[in-house]
């Protein structure tokens, strides 16, 4: 396991127990110093920016009801009930123990990821560049020791049982399908994030719901080229609206294939509420869209 996944959880466990506000403020400041062109000390007692309000929301309320919505296996039934089973990516298998994963009998094109964490994935494309079964097993065993709460402070991840999920790789297997991340405030989509070259030179572009490009980005550089408008944008906006109903904020991630729109995941604290905007005023702008009020039960 990497140093990040050994030292950081210890630091977080102590900080979350003793000084959670200071912990989040320090993490926010460090992320801005590392990835941004400016930095500021997050005010969590009177939050105004988008990041400040996300950080504040990690401290308040009962997040236990969100646990099944960030579990990458459990969330599928909840989403299916709301938008239809046709939008759910097939599940090849869910495994409690990495040793249970049939590494020598997996489909040629598939992905493996932990159900209980964020930002971890193994992509198998059926090429010489794929990791070996031994390497895959080693990585999955590391995943099983992760408690994402102790890496991000997001309480909805604290009590998720560690498992591995296997899904087919959408598209032609050679390249990733475009994914669209809908920033939804109080049940209404407002902005759409498009990531380009995520596994190499990662850049981003943001659009409004009419697919007009915006003059800001979050953490990663702004893409120079514009992404084409998705054919099923209207359907994706409808889906994002349905899935975000009842929440102060949630990011709804969707994929578009040649045949269908597929659900990806729900994210309640993008970048854990610490990623710098390219412009501080945009952090304030999105913050004005987010009211921290009691959320509906799900």
Task: Describe every region a protein language model picked out.
Residues 126-127, 184-188, 198, 257-259:
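Short acidic-glycine loop/turn motifs at beta-strand connectors
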Residues 256-298:
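C-terminal active-site "lid" helix and adjoining low-complexity regulatory extension at the edge
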Residues 1-60:
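Membrane-proximal basic amphipathic "stem/tether" segments
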Residues 60-62, 66-178, 186:
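Active-site nucleotide/adenylate-binding loops and adjacent lid/helix of ATP-dependent enzymes
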Residues 115, 122, 128, 192, ...:
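C-terminal and inter-domain tail/linker signature
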